[in-house]
């Protein structure tokens, strides 16, 4: 499976400019060999929290329409990061994915809001865990958002249910880059799966984002990584490595869920 990871410099509070940028990246970099494209967290407006009432998408209307067009045009699955999204008069940080036929194949509201950013004052937390879902080729994957990375429990269910890739879409700060590397590697090792961390880069107010989008294999080895610059990472994944690792280290056969509280 060939995956392209878009490490974008999100334009703060301007969904139109961000859509234009994404469109240009597709036009310049897309080719028929790519199976999946991945975008970062909150790519429509960034963390312009105080103005999301006016700027957030409405029930994924514009964001889905935009991504659907790209998926159908380029015949590629898109793990479409996440966007600020108003639904039932509440604002969510909503991740979604669209297959190459233009179908919405996943939607997930960020469960864990970041207290350090006072997200709870502006956003509503999701009430459902991330689910496994199928890409066009039948591969089961799952999609989580940024701060979710610090909660290993959230990935356990989709991993045990057969997901072979975990996509963490993020706007992760430079000040915690060490945590980014360590936590992504841990999630890959403990679940015997590929983990792909897609981050943004540049500045959002006083916050510098770390970049360093990264792919880790089921053994915890580095497959590919960007630096802090805006760029695209393209990797080829051998998904047979997941089954091989799960046979070699059968953690899900050893797990004792009845003992855990």
Curated annotation (Swiss-Prot):
Key word Nucleus present: no
EC annotation from Swiss-Prot or TrEMBL: 3.5.-.-
Residues annotated as transmembrane: none
Primary enzyme class: hydrolase
Top-level taxonomic group: Bacteria
Active site: 41 (proton acceptor), 110 (proton donor), 146 (nucleophile)
Record-linked InterPro entries: C-N_Hydrolase (IPR003010), C-N_Hydrolase_sf (IPR036526), UPF0012_CS (IPR001110)
Keywords: Hydrolase
GO MF entries: hydrolase activity
Residue ranges of every copy of the CN hydrolase domain listed in the record: 1-239
Gene3D superfamilies named among the record's database cross-references: Carbon-nitrogen hydrolase (3.60.110.10)
Record keyword Acetylation present: no
Family as reported in the entry's similarity comment: Belongs to the carbon-nitrogen hydrolase superfamily. NIT1/NIT2 family.
Protein name: Hydrolase in agr operon
Species name: Staphylococcus aureus
Organism lineage: Bacteria, Bacillati, Bacillota, Bacilli, Bacillales
């Amino acid at each position: 499976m060939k995956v392209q990871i878009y490490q974008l410099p999100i334009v703060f509070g301007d969904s139109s400019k961000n859509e234009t940028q994404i469109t240009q990246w597709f036009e310049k970099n897309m080719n028929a060999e790519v199976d999946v494209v991945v975008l970062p967290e909150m790519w429509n407006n960034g963390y312009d929290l105080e103005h999301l009432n006016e700027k957030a998408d409405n029930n994924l209307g514009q964001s889905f329409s935009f991504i659907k067009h790209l998926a159908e045009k380029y015949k590629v699955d898109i793990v479409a990061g996440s966007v600020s999204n108003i639904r039932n008069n509440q604002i969510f940080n909503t991740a979604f994915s669209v297959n190459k036929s233009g179908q919405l194949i996943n939607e997930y509201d960020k469960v864990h809001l970041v207290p350090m950013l006072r997200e709870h004052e502006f956003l509503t937390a999701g009430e459902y865990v991330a689910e496994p879902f199928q890409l066009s080729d039948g591969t089961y994957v799952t999609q989580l958002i940024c701060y979710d990375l610090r909660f290993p429990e959230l990935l356990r269910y989709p991993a045990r249910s057969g997901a072979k890739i975990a996509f963490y879409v993020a706007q992760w700060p430079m000040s915690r880059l060490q945590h980014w590397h360590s936590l992504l590697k841990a999630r890959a090792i403990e679940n015997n799966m590929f983990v792909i961390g897609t981050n943004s880069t540049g500045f959002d107010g006083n916050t510098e984002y770390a970049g360093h989008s990264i792919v880790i294999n089921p053994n915890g080895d580095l497959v590919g990584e960007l630096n802090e610059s805006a760029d695209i990472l393209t990797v080829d994944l051998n998904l047979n490595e997941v089954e091989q690792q799960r046979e070699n280290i059968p953690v899900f056969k050893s797990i004792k869920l009845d003992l855990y509280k």
